[in-house]
Structure formats: structure tokens, C-alpha cells
Regions:
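Conserved small/polar residues in nucleotide/adenosyl-binding loops
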Residues: 188-199
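RNA-binding accessory domains that recognize and position tRNA/RNA substrates
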Residues: 1-187
Length: 199
């Protein structure tokens, strides 16, 4: 499978007016968020579902992602918390004994916009040198409407994460142990409870 087959053009527009052209992946809806970078080599699924990345558009510096596919156990939260994803290249033929699907299928299912075939390290240097800024992933060509898009990006304010008002109680099965643990649930990663139970 060629990752460029049937791929639609997409653009990453920064609030300073910089525009990068690539190809869309996942949802075709526009996504506005705070542009940040991540230097991890693996763990893309955990990065996208980490509550700490709520409302961010994440730029991956590692040039290839998705080569081991996705599975439900790697999600740190029930839903993807990131707004969007910027990558260099994704693997259309992943291989792993735990794999349940490909990254493109995962993004479509979760309704998350992504863009690929960009120089993510150049974008990372821009963030590092110039600071964090808002950005937009869109499948609409910004030529002729860039000023309106930039105004929209600048006007976007990062919302308060939903977990600030998180009131749901979650109980884990009781284990025979002399210890009890209580966690204040601020939409913590699923793994925290799982790890507590395993020790």
C-alpha cells in the first residue's frame, strides 16, 4: 500500500502566517490547537491519548511512525485528547503480534486530523526557537484566505481540560492485600490504576 495513493492535500497553518503543505490523514475536519513537539521514538498512541496533551497539535520529530500498528491496550485514555498530529511518514504495512489495526484507521475512527509528508524537524526547530504558537490543520487551500485563517488561529484560546471537573468514580477489582490506595481521579492515564493493581 502506497501512503500517497488517494491522499488529499492538506496544510498546516501557523499563527505567524507560516504555511506547510502535505497530505491529510485521519479526519478531514479542520483542527486548531497549540502546536508542540514530541521527540519520542515510540509510543505514538500513548502520546495522542495522554491527558497532558489535551488540545495540542503534536509534531513528531521521529521520521517514521505507526510501524507496529495500534491496539486498545496502548490507549492511556478512552479518547484521543490531542487535537491533531503532524508526522513525516507513516507505515501502511505495520507488523506486531499485538496489532489490531493501522494508524490511519485509528485516526479516522477517533475523528482526529493529521498531516504527513512534512519536515517535522524543521517545524520543531521553529517551535524551539520561536516558542509555542497555535496552528491549524486543514484540507482547504489557504491561498486567498490565509489572513482569515490566521485571524481564526490567533483568536483560538486553549480550553480548560474536561478533567478539571471530572467527578466520575472508578473502582478497580479488590485484591487480597494489606494496602488500600485511593486516587484523586483527574482523568489519569488508565495505566496508573493498572500499575497500582499489579504491585
Amino acid at each position: 500500500m502506497d501512503i500517497f495513493n488517494n491522499a488529499q492535500q492538506a496544510w498546516l497553518v501557523l499563527e505567524d502566517g507560516t504555511v506547510y503543505e502535505g497530505y491529510g490523514l485521519g479526519s478531514s475536519e479542520d483542527a486548531i490547537g497549540e502546536l508542540v513537539f514530541n521527540t519520542s521514538v515510540v509510543g505514538f498512541q500513548e502520546i495522542l491519548t495522554d491527558p497532558a496533551n489535551a488540545n495540542n497539535i503534536i509534531v513528531e520529530t521521529f521520521p517514521l511512525t505507526g510501524n507496529y500498528g495500534v491496539n486498545h491496550e496502548n490507549d492511556l485514555h478512552e479518547s484521543i485528547t490531542a487535537r491533531g498530529w503532524v508526522i513525516r511518514e507513516w507505515c501502511a504495512q505495520p507488523s506486531n503480534f499485538r496489532m489490531e489495526g493501522r494508524i490511519d484507521e485509528y485516526l479516522e475512527k477517533k475523528n482526529i486530523s493529521a498531516i504527513f509528508d512534512l519536515d517535522t524537524r524543521a517545524i520543531t526547530r521553529k517551535i524551539r526557537d520561536g516558542g509555542v504558537q497555535n496552528a491549524l490543520i486543514t484540507r482547504t487551500n489557504p491561498e486567498g484566505c490565509k489572513d482569515e485563517l490566521v485571524a481564526k488561529i490567533k483568536a483560538w484560546k486553549k480550553p480548560m481540560p474536561a478533567w478539571v471537573n471530572y467527578n466520575e468514580k472508578v473502582s478497580f477489582e479488590k485484591l487480597d492485600s494489606k494496602y488500600s490506595i485511593t486516587m484523586v481521579n483527574r482523568s489519569e492515564e488508565r495505566r496508573v490504576g493498572k500499575e497500582c493493581r499489579s504491585r
